[in-house]
Swiss-Prot record:
Entry's family note: Belongs to the cytochrome P450 family.
Cofactor annotation: heme
Protein's name according to its UniProt entry: Cytochrome P450 71A6
Entries under Gene3D superfamilies matching the protein: Cytochrome P450
Length: 511
Protein backbone atom coordinates (compact mmCIF):
# COMPACT_ATOMS: atom_id res chain seq x y z
CA UNK A 1 0.00 0.00 0.00
CA UNK A 2 2.83 2.38 0.91
CA UNK A 3 4.55 1.75 -2.44
CA UNK A 4 1.27 2.40 -4.28
CA UNK A 5 0.74 5.63 -2.34
CA UNK A 6 4.25 6.86 -3.10
CA UNK A 7 3.71 6.14 -6.78
CA UNK A 8 0.32 7.88 -6.79
CA UNK A 9 1.42 11.18 -5.23
CA UNK A 10 3.68 12.28 -8.14
CA UNK A 11 0.91 11.29 -10.54
CA UNK A 12 -1.61 13.48 -8.69
CA UNK A 13 0.86 16.37 -8.64
CA UNK A 14 1.42 16.25 -12.40
CA UNK A 15 -2.31 15.72 -12.99
CA UNK A 16 -3.04 18.94 -11.09
CA UNK A 17 -0.45 20.86 -13.12
CA UNK A 18 -1.81 19.37 -16.36
CA UNK A 19 -5.38 20.32 -15.50
CA UNK A 20 -4.32 23.89 -14.68
CA UNK A 21 -2.43 24.13 -17.97
CA UNK A 22 -5.29 22.58 -19.91
CA UNK A 23 -7.81 24.99 -18.41
CA UNK A 24 -5.78 27.91 -19.73
CA UNK A 25 -5.98 29.72 -16.40
CA UNK A 26 -3.04 31.77 -15.14
CA UNK A 27 -3.62 32.58 -11.47
CA UNK A 28 -1.65 35.38 -9.83
CA UNK A 29 1.46 34.38 -7.87
CA UNK A 30 0.58 33.33 -4.36
CA UNK A 31 2.58 32.65 -1.21
CA UNK A 32 2.09 29.22 0.38
CA UNK A 33 -0.96 29.04 2.61
CA UNK A 34 -1.93 27.07 5.67
CA UNK A 35 -5.00 24.85 5.95
CA UNK A 36 -8.03 26.78 7.26
CA UNK A 37 -6.09 30.01 7.92
CA UNK A 38 -4.87 30.51 4.38
CA UNK A 39 -2.48 33.48 4.56
CA UNK A 40 -4.03 35.20 7.57
CA UNK A 41 -1.02 34.35 9.69
CA UNK A 42 1.18 36.47 7.40
CA UNK A 43 -0.69 39.75 7.90
CA UNK A 44 0.70 40.70 11.31
CA UNK A 45 -0.13 43.90 13.19
CA UNK A 46 0.41 46.13 10.16
CA UNK A 47 -1.07 44.39 7.10
CA UNK A 48 0.01 47.13 4.68
CA UNK A 49 3.65 46.57 5.64
CA UNK A 50 3.35 42.77 5.57
CA UNK A 51 1.69 42.86 2.15
CA UNK A 52 4.38 45.21 0.85
CA UNK A 53 7.01 42.70 1.95
CA UNK A 54 5.15 39.83 0.26
CA UNK A 55 4.70 41.84 -2.94
CA UNK A 56 8.46 42.34 -3.21
CA UNK A 57 8.77 38.57 -3.44
CA UNK A 58 5.63 37.61 -5.36
CA UNK A 59 5.05 40.68 -7.50
CA UNK A 60 2.72 43.68 -7.73
CA UNK A 61 -0.30 41.44 -8.37
CA UNK A 62 -0.63 38.48 -6.04
CA UNK A 63 -3.41 36.35 -4.65
CA UNK A 64 -3.79 35.42 -1.02
CA UNK A 65 -6.46 33.60 0.92
CA UNK A 66 -7.83 35.07 4.12
CA UNK A 67 -9.33 31.87 5.45
CA UNK A 68 -11.77 30.83 2.72
CA UNK A 69 -11.83 34.28 1.06
CA UNK A 70 -9.69 34.80 -2.09
CA UNK A 71 -7.97 38.20 -2.02
CA UNK A 72 -6.15 39.96 -4.85
CA UNK A 73 -3.51 42.45 -3.68
CA UNK A 74 -2.35 45.23 -6.03
CA UNK A 75 0.89 47.01 -5.12
CA UNK A 76 1.94 49.01 -8.19
CA UNK A 77 0.60 52.02 -10.12
CA UNK A 78 0.02 49.80 -13.17
CA UNK A 79 -2.05 47.29 -11.20
CA UNK A 80 -4.00 50.09 -9.52
CA UNK A 81 -4.72 51.72 -12.88
CA UNK A 82 -5.94 48.43 -14.32
CA UNK A 83 -8.36 47.92 -11.43
CA UNK A 84 -9.56 51.48 -10.78
CA UNK A 85 -9.58 52.84 -14.34
CA UNK A 86 -9.33 50.29 -17.14
CA UNK A 87 -11.63 47.81 -15.39
CA UNK A 88 -13.29 50.14 -12.92
CA UNK A 89 -16.77 48.74 -13.57
CA UNK A 90 -15.61 45.15 -13.01
CA UNK A 91 -14.18 46.12 -9.62
CA UNK A 92 -16.76 48.63 -8.38
CA UNK A 93 -18.51 46.36 -5.91
CA UNK A 94 -17.83 46.21 -2.17
CA UNK A 95 -17.55 42.99 -0.19
CA UNK A 96 -20.29 42.46 2.38
CA UNK A 97 -18.34 43.17 5.58
CA UNK A 98 -20.31 42.49 8.74
CA UNK A 99 -19.06 45.33 10.96
CA UNK A 100 -19.46 48.22 8.47
CA UNK A 101 -22.84 46.79 7.47
CA UNK A 102 -24.12 46.95 11.04
CA UNK A 103 -22.57 50.33 11.84
CA UNK A 104 -23.84 51.97 8.65
CA UNK A 105 -27.49 50.92 8.57
CA UNK A 106 -27.12 47.82 6.42
CA UNK A 107 -24.70 49.60 4.06
CA UNK A 108 -27.04 52.49 3.26
CA UNK A 109 -24.03 54.80 3.11
CA UNK A 110 -21.79 55.66 0.15
CA UNK A 111 -18.44 54.12 1.08
CA UNK A 112 -19.55 50.54 1.79
CA UNK A 113 -22.80 50.22 -0.19
CA UNK A 114 -22.75 47.49 -2.87
CA UNK A 115 -22.52 48.71 -6.44
CA UNK A 116 -25.93 49.23 -7.99
CA UNK A 117 -28.74 51.72 -8.54
CA UNK A 118 -29.03 52.69 -4.86
CA UNK A 119 -25.32 53.45 -4.61
CA UNK A 120 -25.37 55.45 -7.88
CA UNK A 121 -28.22 57.64 -6.65
CA UNK A 122 -26.72 58.28 -3.22
CA UNK A 123 -23.25 59.01 -4.59
CA UNK A 124 -24.75 61.43 -7.10
CA UNK A 125 -26.53 63.28 -4.29
CA UNK A 126 -23.31 63.47 -2.26
CA UNK A 127 -21.19 64.65 -5.18
CA UNK A 128 -23.66 67.21 -6.53
CA UNK A 129 -25.38 68.41 -3.35
CA UNK A 130 -22.86 68.00 -0.52
CA UNK A 131 -19.30 67.84 -1.83
CA UNK A 132 -19.18 69.91 -5.01
CA UNK A 133 -16.44 72.54 -5.31
CA UNK A 134 -19.07 75.26 -4.96
CA UNK A 135 -20.43 73.68 -1.78
CA UNK A 136 -16.95 73.26 -0.29
CA UNK A 137 -16.20 76.93 -0.98
CA UNK A 138 -19.50 77.98 0.62
CA UNK A 139 -18.20 76.72 3.97
CA UNK A 140 -14.96 78.69 3.76
CA UNK A 141 -15.95 81.02 6.62
CA UNK A 142 -16.60 78.05 8.92
CA UNK A 143 -13.13 76.63 8.31
CA UNK A 144 -11.46 80.00 8.83
CA UNK A 145 -13.37 80.71 12.05
CA UNK A 146 -12.68 77.32 13.60
CA UNK A 147 -9.00 77.47 12.63
CA UNK A 148 -8.74 80.85 14.37
CA UNK A 149 -10.40 79.37 17.46
CA UNK A 150 -7.81 76.56 17.49
CA UNK A 151 -5.00 79.12 17.30
CA UNK A 152 -6.52 81.07 20.19
CA UNK A 153 -6.67 77.89 22.30
CA UNK A 154 -2.96 77.29 21.67
CA UNK A 155 -2.16 80.93 22.49
CA UNK A 156 -4.01 80.68 25.81
CA UNK A 157 -2.30 77.42 26.73
CA UNK A 158 1.08 78.91 25.86
CA UNK A 159 0.46 82.04 27.94
CA UNK A 160 -0.61 79.99 30.95
CA UNK A 161 2.33 77.57 30.85
CA UNK A 162 4.86 78.72 28.22
CA UNK A 163 7.08 75.63 28.40
CA UNK A 164 4.35 73.00 28.76
CA UNK A 165 3.64 70.49 26.03
CA UNK A 166 0.47 70.91 23.97
CA UNK A 167 -1.33 67.85 22.61
CA UNK A 168 -1.60 68.94 18.99
CA UNK A 169 -3.40 65.74 18.00
CA UNK A 170 -6.25 66.56 20.40
CA UNK A 171 -6.50 70.12 19.12
CA UNK A 172 -6.59 68.96 15.50
CA UNK A 173 -9.30 66.45 16.40
CA UNK A 174 -11.37 69.22 18.00
CA UNK A 175 -10.84 71.41 14.95
CA UNK A 176 -12.02 68.84 12.43
CA UNK A 177 -14.93 67.69 14.61
CA UNK A 178 -16.12 71.27 15.11
CA UNK A 179 -15.78 72.15 11.43
CA UNK A 180 -17.67 69.05 10.41
CA UNK A 181 -20.41 69.47 13.03
CA UNK A 182 -21.10 72.99 11.81
CA UNK A 183 -21.04 71.98 8.14
CA UNK A 184 -23.01 68.75 8.49
CA UNK A 185 -25.22 69.28 11.53
CA UNK A 186 -25.56 73.06 11.66
CA UNK A 187 -23.85 73.69 14.99
CA UNK A 188 -21.00 72.54 17.19
CA UNK A 189 -21.49 69.85 19.78
CA UNK A 190 -18.59 70.89 21.99
CA UNK A 191 -17.18 73.65 24.14
CA UNK A 192 -18.84 74.47 27.44
CA UNK A 193 -22.41 73.62 26.49
CA UNK A 194 -24.43 72.28 29.40
CA UNK A 195 -27.52 70.13 29.74
CA UNK A 196 -28.59 68.01 26.80
CA UNK A 197 -25.89 69.48 24.58
CA UNK A 198 -23.17 68.32 26.97
CA UNK A 199 -24.53 64.78 26.76
CA UNK A 200 -24.10 65.01 23.01
CA UNK A 201 -20.52 66.25 23.42
CA UNK A 202 -19.33 63.33 25.50
CA UNK A 203 -21.33 60.82 23.51
CA UNK A 204 -20.19 62.12 20.13
CA UNK A 205 -16.47 62.21 20.92
CA UNK A 206 -16.46 58.88 22.72
CA UNK A 207 -18.51 57.08 20.10
CA UNK A 208 -16.67 58.53 17.12
CA UNK A 209 -13.44 57.12 18.56
CA UNK A 210 -15.10 53.74 19.12
CA UNK A 211 -16.68 53.87 15.65
CA UNK A 212 -13.25 54.24 14.02
CA UNK A 213 -11.79 51.43 16.14
CA UNK A 214 -14.63 49.04 15.24
CA UNK A 215 -14.27 49.76 11.51
CA UNK A 216 -10.65 48.60 11.77
CA UNK A 217 -11.55 45.20 13.25
CA UNK A 218 -11.48 42.19 10.92
CA UNK A 219 -12.88 39.33 13.01
CA UNK A 220 -11.49 35.89 12.31
CA UNK A 221 -14.98 34.42 11.94
CA UNK A 222 -15.58 36.64 8.91
CA UNK A 223 -12.99 34.61 7.00
CA UNK A 224 -13.52 31.24 8.67
CA UNK A 225 -17.32 30.84 8.90
CA UNK A 226 -17.33 27.84 11.24
CA UNK A 227 -15.66 30.03 13.88
CA UNK A 228 -18.66 32.34 14.03
CA UNK A 229 -19.62 30.87 17.40
CA UNK A 230 -16.62 32.71 18.90
CA UNK A 231 -18.33 36.07 18.35
CA UNK A 232 -20.37 35.38 21.47
CA UNK A 233 -17.22 35.82 23.53
CA UNK A 234 -15.22 38.59 21.83
CA UNK A 235 -17.48 41.47 22.90
CA UNK A 236 -17.54 43.06 19.45
CA UNK A 237 -21.29 42.61 18.96
CA UNK A 238 -22.03 44.40 22.22
CA UNK A 239 -19.75 47.29 21.30
CA UNK A 240 -21.36 47.62 17.86
CA UNK A 241 -24.85 47.65 19.36
CA UNK A 242 -23.89 50.32 21.90
CA UNK A 243 -22.26 52.62 19.34
CA UNK A 244 -25.05 52.11 16.81
CA UNK A 245 -27.78 52.82 19.36
CA UNK A 246 -26.10 56.01 20.59
CA UNK A 247 -25.49 57.36 17.10
CA UNK A 248 -29.01 56.46 16.01
CA UNK A 249 -30.52 58.37 18.94
CA UNK A 250 -28.19 61.33 18.46
CA UNK A 251 -28.73 61.67 14.71
CA UNK A 252 -32.45 61.09 15.13
CA UNK A 253 -32.57 64.10 17.48
CA UNK A 254 -30.52 66.19 15.05
CA UNK A 255 -32.90 65.39 12.18
CA UNK A 256 -35.94 66.15 14.34
CA UNK A 257 -34.41 69.48 15.46
CA UNK A 258 -33.96 70.45 11.81
CA UNK A 259 -37.54 69.51 10.98
CA UNK A 260 -38.95 71.52 13.90
CA UNK A 261 -36.83 74.53 12.99
CA UNK A 262 -37.80 74.34 9.32
CA UNK A 263 -41.48 74.12 10.21
CA UNK A 264 -41.21 77.02 12.66
CA UNK A 265 -39.36 79.19 10.17
CA UNK A 266 -41.41 77.94 7.22
CA UNK A 267 -38.15 77.36 5.37
CA UNK A 268 -38.73 76.74 1.70
CA UNK A 269 -35.48 77.24 -0.13
CA UNK A 270 -35.61 77.55 -3.89
CA UNK A 271 -32.40 77.74 -5.91
CA UNK A 272 -30.00 79.36 -3.45
CA UNK A 273 -28.89 76.82 -0.83
CA UNK A 274 -25.87 78.70 0.52
CA UNK A 275 -25.77 78.47 4.31
CA UNK A 276 -27.60 75.17 4.56
CA UNK A 277 -25.87 72.32 6.36
CA UNK A 278 -25.76 68.73 5.11
CA UNK A 279 -28.83 67.66 7.07
CA UNK A 280 -30.75 70.66 5.67
CA UNK A 281 -29.76 69.68 2.14
CA UNK A 282 -30.66 66.01 2.55
CA UNK A 283 -34.01 66.83 4.15
CA UNK A 284 -34.74 69.30 1.37
CA UNK A 285 -33.93 66.65 -1.23
CA UNK A 286 -36.16 64.22 0.68
CA UNK A 287 -39.10 66.66 0.61
CA UNK A 288 -38.67 67.54 -3.05
CA UNK A 289 -38.58 63.88 -4.08
CA UNK A 290 -41.06 62.31 -1.66
CA UNK A 291 -43.36 61.24 -4.51
CA UNK A 292 -40.52 59.72 -6.52
CA UNK A 293 -38.41 56.62 -6.01
CA UNK A 294 -35.73 58.64 -4.20
CA UNK A 295 -33.79 56.50 -1.71
CA UNK A 296 -33.30 59.35 0.78
CA UNK A 297 -35.19 58.35 3.93
CA UNK A 298 -34.09 59.14 7.49
CA UNK A 299 -32.04 55.95 7.67
CA UNK A 300 -30.09 56.99 4.58
CA UNK A 301 -29.49 60.47 6.00
CA UNK A 302 -28.02 58.95 9.17
CA UNK A 303 -25.79 56.57 7.20
CA UNK A 304 -24.51 59.32 4.90
CA UNK A 305 -23.76 61.66 7.82
CA UNK A 306 -21.77 58.90 9.55
CA UNK A 307 -19.90 58.34 6.29
CA UNK A 308 -19.08 62.02 6.14
CA UNK A 309 -17.83 61.97 9.74
CA UNK A 310 -15.43 59.19 8.82
CA UNK A 311 -14.17 60.91 5.67
CA UNK A 312 -14.29 64.43 7.08
CA UNK A 313 -12.73 64.02 10.51
CA UNK A 314 -10.60 60.95 11.20
CA UNK A 315 -8.72 60.82 7.89
CA UNK A 316 -8.28 64.62 7.95
CA UNK A 317 -6.77 64.56 11.45
CA UNK A 318 -4.50 61.71 10.39
CA UNK A 319 -3.21 63.63 7.37
CA UNK A 320 -2.53 66.78 9.42
CA UNK A 321 -0.90 64.88 12.26
CA UNK A 322 1.56 63.16 9.94
CA UNK A 323 2.31 66.31 7.92
CA UNK A 324 3.18 68.30 11.04
CA UNK A 325 5.23 65.41 12.43
CA UNK A 326 7.26 65.19 9.22
CA UNK A 327 7.84 68.96 9.22
CA UNK A 328 9.00 68.94 12.85
CA UNK A 329 11.29 66.00 12.13
CA UNK A 330 12.66 67.79 9.04
CA UNK A 331 13.50 71.37 10.13
CA UNK A 332 14.79 72.31 6.67
CA UNK A 333 11.39 71.66 5.12
CA UNK A 334 9.67 73.45 8.01
CA UNK A 335 11.78 76.58 7.45
CA UNK A 336 11.04 76.60 3.72
CA UNK A 337 7.32 76.28 4.37
CA UNK A 338 7.29 78.94 7.09
CA UNK A 339 9.16 81.34 4.81
CA UNK A 340 6.62 80.77 2.04
CA UNK A 341 3.55 81.07 4.26
CA UNK A 342 4.79 84.09 6.20
CA UNK A 343 5.86 85.77 2.97
CA UNK A 344 2.41 85.36 1.46
CA UNK A 345 0.70 86.49 4.67
CA UNK A 346 2.86 89.59 4.93
CA UNK A 347 1.49 91.95 7.53
CA UNK A 348 -1.92 90.27 7.63
CA UNK A 349 -2.89 88.76 10.94
CA UNK A 350 -4.71 85.76 9.49
CA UNK A 351 -4.24 83.33 6.62
CA UNK A 352 -7.25 83.25 4.31
CA UNK A 353 -8.16 80.38 1.99
CA UNK A 354 -7.59 82.65 -1.01
CA UNK A 355 -3.91 82.82 0.04
CA UNK A 356 -3.40 79.07 -0.30
CA UNK A 357 -3.14 79.12 -4.10
CA UNK A 358 0.02 81.21 -3.73
CA UNK A 359 1.70 78.49 -1.64
CA UNK A 360 3.07 75.74 -3.91
CA UNK A 361 5.40 74.38 -1.23
CA UNK A 362 2.46 73.98 1.16
CA UNK A 363 0.66 71.84 -1.42
CA UNK A 364 3.87 69.89 -2.04
CA UNK A 365 4.18 69.20 1.70
CA UNK A 366 0.64 67.78 1.84
CA UNK A 367 1.26 65.59 -1.22
CA UNK A 368 4.52 64.28 0.18
CA UNK A 369 2.95 63.53 3.55
CA UNK A 370 0.05 61.69 1.90
CA UNK A 371 2.55 59.74 -0.22
CA UNK A 372 4.34 58.48 2.88
CA UNK A 373 1.32 58.24 5.19
CA UNK A 374 -1.87 57.37 3.35
CA UNK A 375 -4.62 57.63 6.01
CA UNK A 376 -6.26 54.39 4.80
CA UNK A 377 -3.24 52.42 3.51
CA UNK A 378 -5.19 49.55 1.90
CA UNK A 379 -8.10 51.74 0.77
CA UNK A 380 -11.63 50.38 1.18
CA UNK A 381 -11.78 46.81 -0.22
CA UNK A 382 -13.34 46.18 -3.62
CA UNK A 383 -14.80 43.01 -5.10
CA UNK A 384 -14.76 41.67 -8.65
CA UNK A 385 -18.16 41.19 -10.28
CA UNK A 386 -17.05 38.90 -13.12
CA UNK A 387 -14.20 36.65 -14.21
CA UNK A 388 -11.49 38.82 -15.72
CA UNK A 389 -7.74 39.28 -16.18
CA UNK A 390 -5.47 41.75 -14.40
CA UNK A 391 -2.06 42.30 -16.00
CA UNK A 392 -2.30 38.84 -17.58
CA UNK A 393 -3.50 36.99 -14.47
CA UNK A 394 -6.93 35.42 -14.13
CA UNK A 395 -9.15 36.80 -11.38
CA UNK A 396 -12.39 35.02 -10.51
CA UNK A 397 -15.70 36.73 -9.89
CA UNK A 398 -16.23 37.44 -6.18
CA UNK A 399 -12.53 37.95 -5.44
CA UNK A 400 -11.85 40.58 -2.79
CA UNK A 401 -9.40 43.28 -3.91
CA UNK A 402 -6.98 45.28 -1.76
CA UNK A 403 -5.01 48.15 -3.26
CA UNK A 404 -1.94 48.88 -1.17
CA UNK A 405 -1.62 52.62 -1.82
CA UNK A 406 0.85 52.83 1.09
CA UNK A 407 3.22 50.45 -0.71
CA UNK A 408 2.74 52.30 -4.01
CA UNK A 409 3.67 55.56 -2.31
CA UNK A 410 6.93 54.03 -1.10
CA UNK A 411 7.81 52.07 -4.24
CA UNK A 412 11.49 52.74 -4.99
CA UNK A 413 10.95 51.98 -8.69
CA UNK A 414 8.49 54.89 -8.83
CA UNK A 415 9.93 57.38 -6.34
CA UNK A 416 13.57 58.39 -5.85
CA UNK A 417 14.59 58.23 -2.19
CA UNK A 418 11.17 56.74 -1.57
CA UNK A 419 11.51 56.61 2.24
CA UNK A 420 12.67 60.23 2.56
CA UNK A 421 10.42 63.24 3.15
CA UNK A 422 11.15 65.50 0.16
CA UNK A 423 8.30 67.88 -0.72
CA UNK A 424 10.47 69.38 -3.49
CA UNK A 425 9.77 66.32 -5.64
CA UNK A 426 6.26 67.71 -6.29
CA UNK A 427 7.27 71.26 -7.26
CA UNK A 428 8.13 70.41 -10.86
CA UNK A 429 5.40 67.86 -11.57
CA UNK A 430 1.65 67.88 -12.08
CA UNK A 431 1.14 64.72 -10.01
CA UNK A 432 -1.83 65.15 -7.69
CA UNK A 433 -3.84 63.00 -5.28
CA UNK A 434 -7.28 63.48 -6.87
CA UNK A 435 -7.26 60.04 -8.52
CA UNK A 436 -5.74 60.73 -11.94
CA UNK A 437 -2.16 59.75 -11.08
CA UNK A 438 -1.94 56.18 -9.86
CA UNK A 439 1.42 56.58 -8.15
CA UNK A 440 -0.37 58.77 -5.58
CA UNK A 441 -3.87 57.54 -4.66
CA UNK A 442 -4.52 58.13 -0.93
CA UNK A 443 -8.19 58.82 -1.75
CA UNK A 444 -8.57 56.04 -4.31
CA UNK A 445 -9.80 56.60 -7.85
CA UNK A 446 -12.62 55.81 -10.22
CA UNK A 447 -16.23 55.19 -9.29
CA UNK A 448 -15.34 54.15 -5.76
CA UNK A 449 -12.81 56.90 -5.12
CA UNK A 450 -13.45 59.17 -2.14
CA UNK A 451 -15.71 62.04 -3.29
CA UNK A 452 -14.59 64.17 -0.33
CA UNK A 453 -10.95 64.77 -1.35
CA UNK A 454 -11.57 68.47 -2.03
CA UNK A 455 -13.36 68.83 1.30
CA UNK A 456 -10.43 67.25 3.17
CA UNK A 457 -7.78 69.26 1.32
CA UNK A 458 -9.52 72.54 2.20
CA UNK A 459 -9.23 71.86 5.94
CA UNK A 460 -5.76 70.32 5.78
CA UNK A 461 -4.13 73.14 3.84
CA UNK A 462 -5.70 75.97 5.83
CA UNK A 463 -4.93 74.40 9.21
CA UNK A 464 -1.34 73.55 8.28
CA UNK A 465 -0.63 76.99 6.81
CA UNK A 466 -2.13 78.73 9.85
CA UNK A 467 -0.17 76.69 12.38
CA UNK A 468 3.23 77.22 10.71
CA UNK A 469 2.38 80.90 10.20
CA UNK A 470 1.50 81.52 13.84
CA UNK A 471 3.96 79.27 15.68
CA UNK A 472 7.41 77.78 15.85
CA UNK A 473 7.49 74.30 17.34
CA UNK A 474 9.90 72.23 19.37
CA UNK A 475 9.54 68.91 21.15
CA UNK A 476 9.01 68.71 24.93
CA UNK A 477 11.55 67.58 27.51
CA UNK A 478 14.51 68.34 25.29
CA UNK A 479 13.71 65.56 22.80
CA UNK A 480 15.69 66.04 19.58
CA UNK A 481 13.65 66.30 16.38
CA UNK A 482 15.46 63.33 14.88
CA UNK A 483 14.21 61.25 17.82
CA UNK A 484 10.53 62.06 17.28
CA UNK A 485 8.65 58.76 17.49
CA UNK A 486 7.02 58.12 14.11
CA UNK A 487 5.58 54.71 15.01
CA UNK A 488 2.23 53.82 13.49
CA UNK A 489 -0.89 52.86 15.34
CA UNK A 490 -3.25 50.22 13.96
CA UNK A 491 -6.81 50.41 12.74
CA UNK A 492 -8.91 51.44 9.75
CA UNK A 493 -6.98 54.71 9.57
CA UNK A 494 -3.30 54.77 10.52
CA UNK A 495 -2.61 57.47 13.09
CA UNK A 496 0.67 58.03 14.85
CA UNK A 497 0.93 55.51 17.66
CA UNK A 498 1.50 58.32 20.13
CA UNK A 499 -0.13 61.79 20.05
CA UNK A 500 1.93 64.65 18.69
CA UNK A 501 3.08 66.68 21.72
CA UNK A 502 4.80 70.00 21.00
CA UNK A 503 5.90 73.17 22.74
CA UNK A 504 4.58 76.02 20.56
CA UNK A 505 6.12 79.49 20.55
CA UNK A 506 4.16 82.33 18.92
CA UNK A 507 6.02 83.77 15.95
CA UNK A 508 7.29 87.30 16.58
CA UNK A 509 5.17 88.82 13.80
CA UNK A 510 1.94 87.21 15.03
CA UNK A 511 2.24 87.26 18.82
Amino acid sequence: ILIALLCTLPFLFFLKKWRRSYSGKTPPPSPPKLPVLGNLHQLGTFPHRSLQSLSRRYGPVMQLHFGSVPVLVASSPEAAREIMKNQDLNFSNRPNLSIPRRLLYDNHDVAFAPYGEYWRQIRSICVLQLLSNKRVQSFRRVREEETSIMVEKIMQLQKTTPTAAVNLTDLLTCLTNDVFCRIALGKKYGGTTTGDGEYHVRSLKKNLAEFYVLLGISPLWEYIPWLEWTRRFDGVDRRIEEVSRTFDEFLGKVIQEHRVRDKREDTTVVGDTVGLDFVDLLLQFQRENERSSSPVDDLTIKAVILDMFLAGTDTTVTALEWALSELIKNPRAMKILQKEVRGVAGSKGEIEESDLEKMPYLKAVMKESLRLHAPVPLLVPRESTRDTKVLGYDVASGTRVLINCWAIGRDSSVWEESETFLPERFLETSIDYRGMHFELIPFGSGRRGCPGATFAAAIDELALATLVHKFDFKLPNGVRVEDLDMSEGSGFTIHKKFPLLVVPTPHACTS
